[in-house]
Swiss-Prot record:
Function: Component of the biogenesis of lysosome-related organelles complex-1 (BLOC-1), a complex that is involved in endosomal cargo sorting.
Keyword set, alphabetical order: Coiled coil, Cytoplasm, Transport
Gene Ontology, cellular component aspect: BLOC-1 complex; cytoplasm; endosome
Protein name: Biogenesis of lysosome-related organelles complex 1 subunit CNL1
Annotated InterPro entries: CNL1
Organism of origin: Saccharomyces cerevisiae (strain ATCC 204508 / S288c)
PANTHER family documented for this protein: BIOGENESIS OF LYSOSOME-RELATED ORGANELLES COMPLEX 1 SUBUNIT CNL1
Amino acid sequence: MQDNSSHSRESASAGDDPLGIDKLTVDYDYLLYKMRDYVQSIQLDTTELCKKQNEVMVNGIIENTIDKNIAKFKELLEKCDTLENHYEMLNQLAIITDTFKERIAEAVNNYNSLKKGASKSK
């Protein structure tokens, strides 16, 4: 009995948003959240690395620390690349939404043409 009621709720909610705009909105918000999280992570990592590098310079401890810092800077660059990929996703979303607007307008025009044709034949 519960399966039927949950299925009918899913059908109703799918009927309320057949184009999946709500899911797209949630996905967009999540992408922005991830990007903000990446920026904060990069900021913290950069600050930490700069502080460590300053300690190395001040204390004169240069041996293995530089190699470790280079490895951490490489990780930081990878995070920046990931962030750049997220910005590219946003650009792709902008392109998709622009073409989506055009397709909706075309669908409305086609519908209106069909509606006019159906009313003339009656």
